[in-house]
A protein has these predicted regions:
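Acidic/polar, glycine-enriched structural segments that form the non-catalytic walls/loops
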Residues: 1-348, 580-582, 738, 747-750
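C-terminal capping/lid segments that line or modulate ligand- or cofactor-binding pockets
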Residues: 17-51, 359, 407-408, 420-421, ...
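Non-catalytic C-terminal accessory modules of carbohydrate-active enzymes
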Residues: 72-131, 609-613, 620, 637-751
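Carboxylate/His-rich catalytic cores and anion/metal-binding grooves
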Residues: 85, 94-100, 304-306, 312-320, ...
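Structural helix-adjacent loops and short alpha-helical linkers that scaffold large soluble proteins
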Residues: 309-316, 331-334, 366-376, 436-451, ...
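Helix-terminus loop motifs that line ligand-binding clefts
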Residues: 330-344, 370-430, 436, 443-445, ...
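The feature captures the catalytic groove of carbohydrate-active enzymes
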Residues: 344-352, 399-438, 442-447, 455-535, ...
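Active-site core of glycosidic bond-cleaving carbohydrate-active enzymes
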Residues: 352-381, 447, 509, 523-667
Length: 751
């Protein structure tokens, strides 16, 4: 199956905005929105953007009342220099898709090559026809490099072709004051310090005012044309201009290759020098070689993560799209992680949430554990900040990771649905353990992983207490469901806390004679008495259960509230968060997303199948799925409970969320968590893959209409391919040793 997605574009505002996100280019370091090079009408609400992962400015966070330790500042991802703008004229007429006639207009995402393409045939108002072919790439091998190959052909006229290629340093972030999921208008966050030509290379250097981060970019061009051209180098305030004018005959083509490099002071001592040197090095070769290496890199990615669905090619394409977008978003160094929108847009201001560990990291743990390790190393890098965050909230010991952040400091201005969501600690702890169980990487655990487990475990011990019945309880926290905040004993949170605490102690006990472990306990000043207290709290954790309904209440007060009538709620009032005051939502039984249901995926041994099924059916009736993190979880748990038809239906709701723009906000950036959740819906849901301390197992079923499906994972150094047919699962060992996999009908060794 070809991994290529083609869209025929009408060039309407809503569709263009969507395609800016879907056809973005990224490599984990830089991300460039799939904007139309020539621009769009000024009155269109478009988000033109280029981003560097982990690069930010600090801006004020206004609080209505200055209460103790509420945050007063936050970080926001920067929109950096625009190097994608190119304007075109055909014999004096400006190329403008809102004028003349569009004869052909398509966008292509070629996941096999690691590029995007744009193909347009346009007739000017006077009838001159132009064929425009554009190829764009962010290099995986040269992370700071972005290229545009801009080919213009005159189809039915002899005349002049003019190209104006811009390097614009004077840029602003996008804002929308009516949507809390986007940033507010903070004005220009970058102060332009340098814009200049150094021979034929354009260089721009900007600096933030508060974080004092320097961002540099360099641009240069190569030109291919049939004859001679007039070339000039211009400079305006905050930008440079490369101008080409060439005479062509009908059928002749002019080709411009635009090379851009980016750098920042988070990573480099001299960003300008790095950008210039990297650009020179990239241009010493030819673009064809860079394309070739890009293709090989992407081929290796799919070779290790390949997933095939026999029986639904369109669905298979959507799966490939999701995996590729995650790959584009993945960090390649310790300075950053994966934002809620990846690098495809400014939704949620480029912040990292619990989504990264709970929904996205599992994909990389199974297919590219080195990238998964980078995600966890980022969390280790901000562990001291998490300790400071815990202290700000009054905790004597331990670490509390911020709800949303870039640098490690809390960026959530609304603490009831932000900072109070202590379960982010549980997500990070769970992912550390999944990484360890899957890879067996004991060195990571001893050097970084166990320290995070112990510090998050300490936090739970401090935030909780024993009630009069001797149960360990956790009060005033918020679970995954953001329509229910500041509650006592959120079932999901308590499960996370118990697991975090018990596994932190278990690892310490199992490696008690290890020198590094002893040094760690000494460094953290953790005594055997404290370890015993942590273990006991985990064992005595209170998990709410309602005898009358036979379900796990989401929290202690949830079942006391009236039930929200979702059927009577008009469609235009969803998502509820944009139409109802938070307090109004908090007073009802209504869920934004999977909460207790998510716990049944992660901690399925805590309850009987009967309790989980009753709870699932109860919460299903009151969950809006306003969050993109929801339907994939309902699919996974439905698979676990044997409700296969329902599992497939929820998966169908999840898999094309971005491609079909079902939440109407993909224009702000793709939903990386949902993409990871879709992967889990197949691997952990349909195939029933489980990896834990005891080993690896599957419990598969075949969705109706599918003939078979397969996927590859890495487990303990081995590359395995699972193929599920109607008769069961086959495991093939492609590299390494054959593990003991429970639940398969056959093991094959293809080495």
């Amino acid at each position: 199956m070809k991994r290529i997605i083609t869209r025929h574009e009408k060039f309407e505002e809503k569709e263009v905005n969507l395609h800016e996100a879907l056809f973005s280019n990224a490599n984990g370091y830089i991300g460039i929105r799939g904007n139309v090079e020539e621009g769009v009408p000024e009155d269109w609400n478009t988000m033109r953007g280029t981003y560097i992962n982990g690069v930010y400015e600090i801006i004020p966070m206004k609080q209505a009342e200055s209460l103790c330790n509420l945050i007063e500042k936050k970080q926001t991802m920067l929109n950096v220099a625009d190097t994608q703008t190119i304007c075109l004229k055909a014999d004096g007429e400006r190329f403008d898709l809102t004028k003349g006639n569009i004869l052909e207009n398509e966008r292509i995402l070629d996941m096999e090559q690691g590029i995007t393409k744009r193909h347009v045939i346009w007739a000017s108002p006077s009838g001159k026809e132009i064929e425009l072919s554009v190829t764009r790439m962010t290099s995986f091998l040269i992370p700071s490099l972005f290229t545009i190959e801009y080919n213009v052909k005159a189809l039915n006229f002899d005349g002049d072709i003019e190209i104006e290629s811009y390097h614009i340093a004077d840029v602003k972030n996008y804002s929308n004051p009516d949507d809390p999921r986007l940033g507010d208008d903070s004005g220009a966050l970058l102060k332009v310090e340098v814009v200049k030509w150094r021979e034929d290379m354009s260089v721009a250097v900007s600096k933030t005012s508060v974080s004092e981060i320097v961002v540099a970019s360099a641009v240069s061009h190569r030109l291919r044309l049939p004859g001679k051209a007039e070339i000039s180098y211009g400079k305006e305030e905050g930008r440079t201009l490369y101008h080409v004018k060439a005479g062509v005959k009908a059928g002749e083509e002019l080709s411009l290759i635009k090379y851009s490099t980016f750098s920042d002071s988070v990573r480099e001592e001299d960003p300008e020098e790095f950008a210039r040197t990297t650009l020179k090095d990239a241009m010493r070769g030819n673009l064809a070689d860079i394309y070739k290496k890009q293709k090989e890199y992407v081929e290796e990615f799919f070779a290790n993560s390949e997933m095939e669905i026999d029986g639904d090619e369109e669905l298979g394409q959507a799966v490939n799209f999701n995996m590729y977008e995650l790959f584009q978003s993945a960090p390649r160094d310790k300075y950053c992680s994966i934002a809620a929108k990846g690098l495809s847009g400014e939704g949620y201001e480029g912040h990292y949430f619990w989504d990264t560990e709970m929904y996205v990291a599992p994909f990389f743990i199974l297919t590219n554990p080195e990238l998964a390790k980078k995600i966890l190393q980022y969390r280790y890098g901000i562990l001291d900040k998490a300790r400071e965050n815990a202290a700000l909230l009054g905790h004597k010991k331990g670490a509390l990771y911020p709800w949303r952040t870039i640098t490690g400091e809390e960026c959530s201005g609304y603490f009831p649905s932000g900072t109070a969501a202590y379960h982010i600690n549980g997500a990070i702890a769970y992912t550390i353990l999944q990484y360890f169980f899957t890879t067996g990487d004991k060195d990571f655990m001893l050097e970084q992983g166990e320290e995070m487990l112990l510090e998050t475990a300490r936090l739970w011990l401090d935030v909780g207490n024993y009630d009069r019945k001797g149960r360990f309880v956790i009060n005033e926290v918020t679970g995954p469901d953001e329509y229910t905040c500041m509650t006592d004993n959120n079932y999901y949170t308590n499960c996370c806390a118990a697991y975090n605490m018990s596994m932190a102690v278990a690892f310490a006990e199992e490696h008690s004679s290890n020198k590094k472990l002893k040094e760690l306990l000494k460094k953290l000043e953790i005594t055997s008495k404290e370890l015993k207290e942590i273990k006991e709290a985990a064992e005595k954790m209170y998990l709410p259960y309602d005898e009358e309904l036979g379900i796990n209440p989401q929290d202690d007060s949830f079942l006391q509230k009236p039930v929200w009538d979702l059927k009577a709620t008009p469609k235009e009032e969803f998502p509820l968060l944009l139409h109802y005051h938070p307090l109004h939502l908090y007073r009802y039984q209504v869920c934004k997303q999977a909460d207790t249901v998510l716990s049944y995926f992660l901690f399925e041994d805590k309850q009987s199948k009967e309790v989980m099924k009753k709870s699932y059916e109860y919460y299903e009736k009151i969950t809006t799925h306003d969050s993109s993190l929801s339907t994939c979880v309902f699919s996974i748990v439905a698979s676990r409970l044997g409700m296969h038809k329902k599992a497939v239906e929820y998966f169908g709701d999840s898999i094309k969320l971005d491609l079909l723009n079902t939440h109407n906000n993909t224009k702000d950036g793709v939903h990386t968590a949902n993409m990871g959740g879709c992967y889990m819906a197949i691997v952990n849901g349909f195939a029933g893959l489980r990896i834990n301390k005891e080993g690896i197992s599957v419990d598969p079923f075949m969705p109706e209409g599918w003939k078979k499906y397969s996927f590859k994972i890495k487990y303990r150094g081995s590359l395995l391919k699972f193929t599920v047919t109607k008769s069961g699962a086959i495991c093939e060992v492609l590299k390494g040793e054959a593990p003991d996999v429970k639940g398969i009908k056959e093991m094959r060794n293809e080495k």
